[in-house]
């Protein structure tokens, strides 16, 4: 009897296991991607002429920009005839490895854009439709939007709207966000928008349960109108559009815990700033991204940083650590930012202090291989970071 029961159980198990579709047990791990951006940002002609050499670097794509046509709130009409040479150049880029490229839009309000001026916004909408064509021409996955205002700030309140309630201005900004994304989707119905930061910027107010108190706290923040704009973008996003909070704050992380907390902030806590009817859409179409700031980890900045109190070997370990945990915690994209180095020009063509630091490429590759192979990082930086902080504190005392 026992033998018959065993055979019966074995047969049932075989049938049961055999009934599972192969793709339930043989799925590949989600592939994470690293894209490069920095002061070495390139233009379409450089990319076209150097794409084979560029693709030797350990990235999945780049964030680059068109000449002159790159400010979202430019109220001057863009003419396709003026942009056409760059559209042609974009179309000539023969990418192979770099399948995840983004064209950049900046948010500086250098032309006195008015959220309530329909003439301004009719122009901006047409400009963004043309920019959408540029994105498609270059076979880019989408747009990189930098909301930081390097000039006149469009996100302030009251600013020039002292005669209007905050709710009135926020609703208008939300409307413009809808129009903005709709225009960008004109030629790219399945668009990816990588923003250097979104609602994760407001992590210190999202846990306030009282909506009125939370709004009062928001009014004291930098870029107070930004949440309204992003809610408009979310509202107008087509089903195939992905919106990425790039979490620029990760520039300064010195522990794994900070990466994990940031992911939870973006994916969960930040939804306090999202209207209830949009939260299901937020969960479906907003991703958490992560950022790397090489200058910060390799002591290349002119301001004092923890990394300046680490040895060169420790600095590379610090960078590898951040690459590893950025890949671990991003939904899909990590953007790698640098200022005082150039990934694309040979050493003889850049200033001495802009040459790519020795070991940085190897550290990035090492972190990526460990992540992709499901291996642990293999070391902890807590001790060396604490020692560096003590040295830094001792210097100040």
Predicted regions and their residues:
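Positively charged n-region of N-terminal signal peptides that target proteins for export
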Residues: 1-5
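Bacterial N-terminal signal peptides
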Residues: 9-19
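Boundary at the C-terminal end of the N-terminal hydrophobic targeting segment
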Residues: 21-26
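Glycan-processing catalytic domains of CAZymes
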Residues: 27-397
């Amino acid at each position: 009897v026992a033998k018959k029961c065993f055979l019966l159980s074995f047969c049932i198990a075989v049938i049961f296991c055999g009934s599972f579709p192969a793709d339930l047990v043989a799925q590949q791990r989600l592939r994470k991607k690293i894209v490069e951006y920095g002061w070495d940002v390139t233009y379409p002609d450089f990319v076209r002429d150097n794409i084979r050499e560029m693709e030797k670097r350990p990235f999945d794509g780049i964030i680059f920009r068109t000449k002159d046509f790159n400010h979202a709130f430019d109220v001057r009409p863009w003419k396709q005839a003026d942009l056409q040479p760059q559209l042609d150049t974009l179309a000539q880029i023969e990418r192979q490895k770099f399948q995840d490229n983004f064209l950049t839009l900046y948010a500086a309000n250098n032309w006195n854009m008015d959220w309530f001026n329909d003439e301004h916004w009719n122009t901006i909408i047409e400009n963004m439709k043309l920019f959408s064509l540029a994105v498609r021409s270059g076979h880019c996955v989408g747009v990189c939007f930098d909301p930081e205002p390097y000039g006149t700030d469009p996100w302030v309140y009251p600013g020039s709207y002292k005669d209007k309630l905050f709710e009135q201005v926020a609703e208008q900004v939300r409307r413009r966000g809808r129009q903005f994304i709709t225009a960008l989707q004109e030629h790219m119905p399945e668009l990816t928008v990588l923003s250097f930061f979104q609602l994760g910027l407001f992590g210190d107010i999202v846990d306030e349960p009282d909506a009125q108190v939370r709004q009062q706290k928001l009014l004291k923040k930098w870029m107070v109108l930004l949440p309204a704009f992003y809610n408009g973008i979310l509202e107008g996003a087509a089903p195939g559009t992905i919106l990425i909070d790039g979490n620029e704050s990760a520039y300064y992380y010195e522990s794994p815990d900070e990466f994990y907390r940031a992911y939870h902030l973006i994916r969960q806590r930040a939804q306090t700033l999202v209207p209830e009817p949009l939260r299901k859409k937020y969960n479906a179409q907003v991703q958490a991204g992560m950022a790397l700031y090489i200058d910060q980890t390799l002591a290349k900045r002119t301001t004092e940083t923890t990394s300046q109190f680490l040895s060169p070997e420790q600095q590379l370990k610090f960078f590898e650590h951040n690459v590893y945990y950025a890949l671990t915690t991003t939904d899909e994209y990590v953007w790698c930012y640098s200022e005082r180095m150039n990934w694309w020009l040979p050493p003889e063509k850049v200033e001495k202090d802009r040459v790519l630091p020795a070991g940085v490429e190897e550290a990035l590759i090492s972190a990526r291989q460990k992540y992709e192979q499901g291996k642990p990082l293999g070391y902890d930086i807590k001790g060396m970071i604490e020692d560096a902080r003590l040295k830094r504190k001792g210097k100040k005392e």
